Amino acid sequence: FIRRFKDNNLVPTLCDAPNLDPFGACRVCSVEVALEKNGVLKTLASCHTPVSEGQHIYTSTETVKTLRKNIIELVLTDHPLDCLTCEVNGNCELQTVAAQVGIRNVRYPEGDNHLYRMKDLSHPYMTSDLSKCINCYRCVRACDEVQGEFVLSMYGRGFDSKIIKGLDASFMESDCVSCGACSQACPTSAISDVFQSKAIQATDTTRTICTYCGVGCNLEVSTNNGEILSIRAPYDAEVNQGHTCLKGRFAFQFYDHPDRLREPMIKKNGKFEVVTWKEAYNFITKKLI
C-alpha cells in the first residue's frame, strides 16, 4: 500500500520505485498495522504489504519514526558524508529521506566501511561509485525488470556484498547497453549519468516526445536558457513507463550541432539551396503526383 501514501510524503522509501516490483530491502517504509481498531500493532514494510479490508494503518507512530531514523543512521555509517561536493547534491533521495526522518548527526562510532571503493569512469555517459551504494538493489532490478539485460547483480554476502557488472568488469567491458535505467533508478550517486548533476541548474522542465524512432517515448527535458542539461523518462508515461534507450536519454547534443539542418533545402543545378517551407512542400507535392 506504499503507492497510496507516497504522493503525500507520509512514508519515506529508498528501495521502492514506481516502475519496479516491490522488494523490501531497506525497510524505511515500515508502518504499523492493526487488524482492528486499538488492536495489536505489527510493523510491516508497506512496499510489499497488500491492502486488505479492515486494516488500520499508522504511518507516523513513535515506533516507526524511531525505526526509520535508526535505519538511516546505520546506512550513513557506511556512506560518504560529502554531500556538499557530491554530484547529486540537492537531487539525492538518501539526502531527502535523511532530512525527512530528522537526521542531524550519526550516533554510531566510525567502524569498518566501504569508502575505499574506486570509481568506475570507463563509460562516456555513466559513472559508478560503489562507496555510495546502499544495497537497495534498484539498479539490479531496473536492469532486470525494465531493460531485461541482467548485466548488474549482487556479489558476495553480508558486509562484503556489492554490485558488479557482468563478471565484476567495468561498464565498458560488460554487456551494458547504456540505456541508463540503473542511473535513473539509483537513489544516491552510486550509479549516475554525467548529465544528472547539471539538472539541478535547470530553470525549466519540458515534457516532450523522443524523435529518434516511432515508439513515441515520453521524455522530461531539463533546460536552462534553452540549453538541454539532462533528460529523464517520466514514470507516468504510458508508452515507456519511466524508461528510454541510449539515444533518448543521452544523445541530445545533436540539437545544436553546427551540422544540423535547420532550414529546408532543395538541390538545384547539383547544389543544395535554402528555400522556404512553401517551396519545399510544393516540391514534395509535385514529386508525389
Feature map (PLM): residue ranges:
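N-terminal cofactor/phosphate-binding cores enriched in small/glycine residues
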Residues: 1-53, 62-67
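N-terminal export/assembly segments and adjacent metallocofactor-ligating motifs
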Residues: 1-4, 35-40, 54-79, 84-289
